[in-house]
């Protein structure tokens, strides 16, 4: 995004430590990140701007010496210092499908949920503060499903977890453990949806400072009189009422949902089909919340959460629900990746090239999301926490139609609202805070404005070129 600053360019911060076997490859990664972030929704030819950069981009994604994880490791390392500044991080993991069915010539893709569709699966762990600010990506797994695995559901109980897609949840928990080792003063909670309700995940060994929060999918056996999870929780009295904000979903508008809340400790029995392994029971806490009177035509919100975090008070129960509500942030990030960065429109001919492309655009999508949420969490902070000097100066001059910016930067909230205006945000009384869509459009406009600002003010430092 910063097109002309010599120092602290965001792409340098996130990718400078990438170990790609040759310093020139790292420089190329930084150059690509900078260029693609300026126009995240544009095609590669449009974003690159000239034949030399376009050819370099294609060569980069075609380089078999580069592993997708190599491209992400530097960003993960840059994320750790951000994690170390907060007491609690929610490591939210989720899977999405990237569908390239519209590009049938692409080789190496696998089947998706709809058997006729082809694409890649992406399982990502995003680090959030409880205030919903995404601090970075902790882990990402990208793969094409093997067509031979289709139809093996009947044998899933006979196969170890390492041979199933469920391993992705354990891999992401391991990423939270690694983050804890790097940031020993920060507490981590790994958050997963119903697909993460796997015994091996719930029973994983964890050090102090790393916990689990998983939405229940199965009515598992427990060591209590009611015998099963749901019956045990249903036997508890309603102890509190919670209110959560439900985001927009398709044609359904956002709404506020009141939930009846109950909780209790319980102990899960090991799976019966694994008796020979002599697995141990798993002590957990359950928090149940249900929307008793949803709007007509709307399914009620109902969560049964299993957690290793103790729940003794109303405040603790409500806190666990609030943590799980943070999971919707991953869905927002998925939308930015797909709609804002148009990752499914990338035409690179092979799945292997796409697997190198996804991590780069994932970090670009995170950057857009970070700007959106940071301005809501710390609105009065100076905008320099996000923007380079020339960016906020160009933004100010463009919005106010003035040739000279003030000596002091505006607040982060004010700057983000101005960027959103560039993307079509009207800022009317009932519009609320700008969202990711208008911001990614606004950032593209800001790039052009800043470039012109640097050209028209020759005294400013010139843009450093990478690669």
Give the role of each language-model region.
Residues 1-106, 114-121, 126-467:
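Single, function-defining residue in the core of a domain
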